[in-house]
Amino acid sequence: MSYQVSVAVVGATGYVGVELVRLLLSHPMVKIKYLCATQSSGKLLSSNYFHISQDDISVNISSFDDIDLSKVDVVFLCLPHGTSSEVVRKIHDVVRIIDLSADFRIKDAEVYKQWYGSHCCPDLVRDFVYGLTEIYWEDIQRSRFIACPGCYPTSVLIPLFPLLRLCLIKSQGIIVDAKSGVSGAGRSVKQDKLFCEVYDVIKSYKISDHRHIPEIEQELCFAACREDINLQFVPNLIPVKRGMMSSIYLELEEGVSLTDVREALLLFYKDSSFVFIDEEKAMTTRSVVGTNYCYLGVFPGRVPNTIIIMSVIDNLLKGAAGQAVQNFNVMMSYDEKIALSNIPYF
């Protein structure tokens, strides 16, 4: 067996954290040294999640303050915004970090403050590479610090980044209607996430006010080399555990056809292990749930010179834990598909 990378998963008992652990357990180059959480110290992960047994992982959950960082190569942070940056400030000089919070995604400190509040270490934000793997592969490979994108931004940016970079779509008037499984709201106990509140109901929330908006707009501006892109964004919770579908409404640049857009996406992602253009599979989350895949479909709009792009991902995998492992693989110069070759759930 080759050298195994020792990792710590901080925030291991949340939905994203436990998905990350599940993936890392199948990674031949990884040894999970520590699992950290605030409320389950001393317990096994199997006491929180029955689908993981003591035979799978016998590491007791510990407090972050009790771990020995000299025995860790990479720390995965599955923590809320604000909490994650506090940890990064302590460990930045010691280990590689893959952060799944929002704390290091937004590069403008004032924009971050407007949407999330004050940042405890804004001077460290520039050290982090935005971890949209298919777009920033080379930067990720060279970096020690990765800020993994949010789930909504992942589903939107995978199709739009190359189209804006290639000047195929207009940068203004972008409309996104996105639907997410309830796991996207996290594991904390809140009334609006109880079974009777979410079952058999579709609920819109934070219309034009979702915290993922500035993250999406930042990357769209980078893609288009502009400073003023604003999009209409409506997030919706749907009564399923996992899965995400974004319907994206776009106006084409003059002289550009639907075929041009589809061929551009096919060419851009021709070597991708996880992003595929397939109209039939892009119309259902069943094609992606349980995987790190993203399926895209390009459809004609009824309004002249418009198109509709459908983008589906698993919000817990390509939208979170799966992309984190993909980034880890790229960072460590491993095959990006290691531990991510799942087939979809039925």
Curated annotation (Swiss-Prot):
Single GO term (MF): NAD binding
Primary localisation category: cytoplasm
SMART domains attached to this UniProt entry: Semialdhyde_dh
Catalytic site positions: C151
GO biological process terms held by the UniProt record: L-arginine biosynthetic process
Subcellular locations according to the entry: Cytoplasm
EC number: 1.2.1.38
Keyword Methyltransferase: no
Domain of life: Bacteria
Function recorded in the entry: Catalyzes the NADPH-dependent reduction of N-acetyl-5-glutamyl phosphate to yield N-acetyl-L-glutamate 5-semialdehyde.
Protein name: N-acetyl-gamma-glutamyl-phosphate reductase
Organism: Ehrlichia chaffeensis (strain ATCC CRL-10679 / Arkansas)
Highest classification ranks of the organism: Bacteria, Pseudomonadati, Pseudomonadota, Alphaproteobacteria, Rickettsiales
